Amino acid sequence: MLDLIIKGGQVVTSWGVGDWEIAVQGDKIVGVGAPGTFSEEAGRVIDASGKIVVPGGIEPHAHIAAPFVAQGQNLSTAPPEQVSRAALFGGTTTLLDFAVQNPGIDVNRAIAERTSVWQGNSYADYSHHLMLSGEIDSNIMGQVREAVEEGFASVKIFTTNVRPPTTPGPGRMVRMGHLHDLMELIQRHGAMLLVHSEDDDMVMNMYRKLGDEERTVWWNMPLVHNNESEDVSFRRVLNVAGWTGSPVYFVHVSARQGIQAIGESRAKGMPVYGETLHNYCCFNSDKDRKSVV
């Protein structure tokens, strides 16, 4: 006997939209068919007449219970209980945040620490991207391989240190040689590489230039993280991806040039993807100074 049948709704699938029924056994969809396909009894039947039935959404980029400093205060983003509950009300059933491996910390410890934040505290399904920082030695590479084999199938890196050169603490940037080796591992084991892609030389040069000119107000951020930097860095990463065969997922794409680089690579059949943020879709740099923080 099936556990659940959903009938009467307009069902959205990867192959189209139709008036179909959905059969569920345990926690998995086991069938989608025309009305009357699943005539056997079910533990529960949901009448979705007049409704659109869609798969649960996946939030692929979230920073949950993540520390940050604002106006001199040590704060953190909302915890899993709060975020996962809100996500379910919006139809999102899976959340992915980041297990951060800082220099000197091994990957297994990073995963364990992040999992402890979520375990028993989430209403939704969850997992973590591995976020690597700085030098990636052979030990870290081996730990990444093991983590991928255990199901943590995505890794994020930065091609820039992002923050001003005066920021204390270790940097985030992964150098191109390590990126190449990581891409080979990613391709070999069927994982996905997420890249925060900017040209570090350009970013740091603009930080120094604006500092010298006493123009470090927040609305000049687009001058630091600019279109030229995104264009140069995306194409450099994509060139290495072409040599290694690695898939690439660019996070928070913000420039037309980045979109063009992704489109050109996809036209060649490369497994390249990009995501953006809603604020990039609603505002451009001309409106930054007028926006509300």
Residues covered by each model-derived region:
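Histidine-rich, glycine-flanked metal-binding segment
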Residues: 1-56, 70-71
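Divalent metal-coordination and catalytic microenvironments
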Residues: 9, 22, 27, 50, ...
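Short, ordered loop/turn segments at secondary-structure junctions
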Residues: 34-35, 69, 99-101, 131, ...
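Metal-associated gating/positioning segment near the N- to mid-region
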Residues: 48-121
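Active-site mouth loops of central-metabolism enzymes
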Residues: 60-78, 127-140, 223-228
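Short catalytic-loop micro-motif centered on adjacent basic/acidic residues
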Residues: 96-97, 127-130, 247-252
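Histidine/acidic residue-rich metal-binding segments in metalloenzymes
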Residues: 139-293
